Amino acid sequence: MAIFIDIGNTIKDFIQNNISELKQPGSIVFDSPAEIDPPGTPMLSVFLYQIVENSFLKNTGPEFVKNDQYLKPPLTIDLYYIFTPYARDKENELIIMEKILQLFHDNSVLKGDMLKGKLKDNGNDEIRIFSNSLTFEEINKLWERFPSKAFKLSAAYTLSPVRIPSGKPPVKVTRIMEKEINVYMKEIEY
């Protein structure tokens, strides 16, 4: 089970199949912007900067796999990414950024054949992509974590919900298959 790797491969294939400037091998990296030196060819940094448990889906009930067994619910998380384009000139960076924004606007759900690896097998039938509108202060704080790098235009997106199955084995239970109710009536005297 490698959910994060499968998510990364899904993002990478999705972008490479839709943005011509990023089709070359090695043009999409999952490194921190602090680790990237300006390349000669266009490149996109897809940096996972935060992982948060999804509080809305935290209380999901168990999933019955057989009449007498259930699985503990999966851990449901939200993944926060910043997408930062790199190119020789600012014009190409802006073109790549515009195409990223357009791609995620037009395709806000990853599903079906778009999902790579074992994402579907692990309960991730669809993963939504939505803009994470960071304020200027939040973006500034994020870029302060890369002290040797100058601020670069970035877009922040959240992928949600991402399900990570429980590592516990199925729990055996005795389910009520039939219920018998006896109703007795007491005679009332008038």
List each language-model region with its residue ranges:
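Charged, amphipathic alpha-helical segments and their flanking helix caps
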Residues: M1-E21, Y70-N124, V162-Y190
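Small/polar-rich, solvent-exposed N-terminal microdomains that initiate assembly or binding
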Residues: M1-G61, G117-G123
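Short structured motifs
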Residues: F30-S32, V65-K66, I139-L142
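Short glycine/proline-enriched loop/turn "hinge" motifs that connect secondary-structure elements
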Residues: P38-P39, Y70-L75, P147-F151
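Broad gene-expression machinery/nucleic-acid interaction feature
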Residues: T41-S45, T76-I82, K152-A156
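Active-site-adjacent structural patch at catalytic or cofactor/ligand-binding sites
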Residues: F47-Y86
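Flexible glycine-/small-residue-rich
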Residues: L48-Q50, T158-P161
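Acidic-leaning, charged glycine-interspersed low-complexity segments
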Residues: I95, D106-S160
